[in-house]
Amino acid sequence: MVFFPHRHLIGIKGLTEQDITYLLDKADEAVKISRQREKKTSTLRGLTQINLFFEASTRTQASFELAGKRLGADVMNMSVGNSSVKKGETLIDTAMTLNAMRPDVLVIRHSSAGAAALLAQKVSCSVVNAGDGQHEHPTQALLDALTIRRAKGKLSRIIVAICGDVLHSRVARSNILLLNAMGARVRVVAPATLLPAGIAEMGVEVFHSMREGLKDADVVMMLRLQRERMSGAFVPSVREYYHFYGLDAETLKAAKDDALVMHPGPMNRGVEIASEVADGPQSVIAEQVEMGVAVRMAVMETLLVSQNQGPRSDGMMA
């Protein structure tokens, strides 16, 4: 029997191909549960999950909440807007307070890179990173991988083009790490102003033209233009950005005929993607949302149940 040797899920970095495959296989089982009429199980009955979101989120928080409830856990959502953090309490103080309540898992989203890793050092329960600044978003990468694997039958040797605001995207970083670990060929397509320094060292091919970057791609993954994280003029205008880097039906023709179109959401229609593509036959954006619940069910079950069945490290995969 294969065991998952980690206590927390802080990032994709540090996960092996075997670890990733284990979680994806477990998520495949969760998909079956989610498609049943009776979706609730007793796997995590008696265990407590706290969702601690310091950044606004709709789909991710709802997905984690639904995942926990389908596994039978008691789920509590912490509203930061009404919390002691607004009164000056530090993240560490908050962590210590929550730890005293003896939860079994804390799910955290925070605007600062490293927040999840810091929390994991201060609490006695498992920690799941739901996105920390521009660092990582591991469950998003896992759900994207599950979506691709279910559609294409594999992850190895496929060509994935990640397009758009790579600089500010934790989704891009986690996907690059995961796809490389699984043997995919990864491309990034963006203007130079929206690419981090040293991006090529992450094992990707860099393109500044959509048509060139999408040529023969099996998967086209569009990223939102994250204007809320921009302090300067990274693009001349939204209109010009869409002209050169937006995905419409004509641009998509550069990819393979059966290429998947993906987007982590929320989408900016007419900014990075056209509605004709987002709602078109090659889009698997709705499937990504469905796979998100399954992946988070798999992560929760693995950390809270499987970890007690074999050797485990306290490595945080940061």
Curated annotation (Swiss-Prot):
UniProt feature coiled coil, ranges: none
Keywords: Pyrimidine biosynthesis, Transferase
InterPro entries in alphabetical order: Asp/Orn_carbamoyltranf_P-bd, Asp/Orn_carbamoylTrfase, Asp/Orn_carbamoylTrfase_sf, Asp_carbamoyltransf, Asp_carbamoyltransf_Asp/Orn-bd
Entries under PROSITE patterns matching the protein: CARBAMOYLTRANSFERASE
Taxonomy, superkingdom: Bacteria
GO CC, alphabetical: cytosol
Family in the record: Belongs to the aspartate/ornithine carbamoyltransferase superfamily. ATCase family.
Protein name per its UniProtKB record: Aspartate carbamoyltransferase catalytic subunit
Organism: Rhizobium johnstonii (strain DSM 114642 / LMG 32736 / 3841) (Rhizobium leguminosarum bv. viciae)
UniProt lineage: Bacteria, Pseudomonadati, Pseudomonadota, Alphaproteobacteria, Hyphomicrobiales
